[in-house]
């Protein structure tokens, strides 16, 4: 189990990313736009750098919804490998069966 502080930190990051997503997208569009003046592109770059670090989606970490485990998380299910296996063995995941060949 992950510490509560780590789970809360991730939640805070998700909220920060959501808060700044629109503004970041606008600034990135200006930076990539070749028709924009160099000054405008530079100002957009500086404004993007002044935003909080946690506003970047790249800093978010996928965690297991049950345990908070950061590694071995399946995106499709949102569960860590251990909890996914337990759920599959109980039959809680429709369509998921244990491999056999």
Swiss-Prot record:
GO MF, one example: rRNA binding
Entries under InterPro entries matching the protein: Ribosomal_uS14, Ribosomal_uS14_bac/plastid
Keyword tags: Ribonucleoprotein, Ribosomal protein, RNA-binding, rRNA-binding
GO biological process, one term: translation
GO CC, alphabetical: cytoplasm; small ribosomal subunit
One Pfam family per UniProt: Ribosomal_S14
SUPFAM superfamilies from the UniProt entry: Glucocorticoid receptor-like (DNA-binding domain) (SSF57716)
Cross-referenced NCBIfam families: PRK08881.1
Role of this protein: Binds 16S rRNA, required for the assembly of 30S particles and may also be responsible for determining the conformation of the 16S rRNA at the A site.
Assembly: Part of the 30S ribosomal subunit. Contacts proteins S3 and S10.
Family recorded in the similarity comment: Belongs to the universal ribosomal protein uS14 family.
Name this protein carries in UniProt: Small ribosomal subunit protein uS14
Organism: Pseudomonas syringae pv. tomato (strain ATCC BAA-871 / DC3000)
This protein's encoding gene: rpsN
């Amino acid at each position: 189990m992950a510490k509560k502080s780590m789970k809360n930190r991730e939640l805070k990051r998700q909220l920060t990313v959501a808060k700044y997503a629109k503004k970041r997208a606008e600034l990135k569009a200006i930076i990539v736009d070749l028709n924009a003046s160099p000054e405008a592109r530079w100002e957009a770059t500086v404004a993007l750098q002044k935003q909080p670090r946690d506003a970047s989606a790249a800093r978010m970490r996928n965690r297991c919804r049950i345990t908070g485990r950061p590694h071995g998380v399946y995106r499709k299910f949102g569960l860590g490998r251990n909890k996914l296996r337990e759920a599959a063995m109980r039959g809680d995941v429709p369509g998921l069966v244990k491999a056999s060949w």
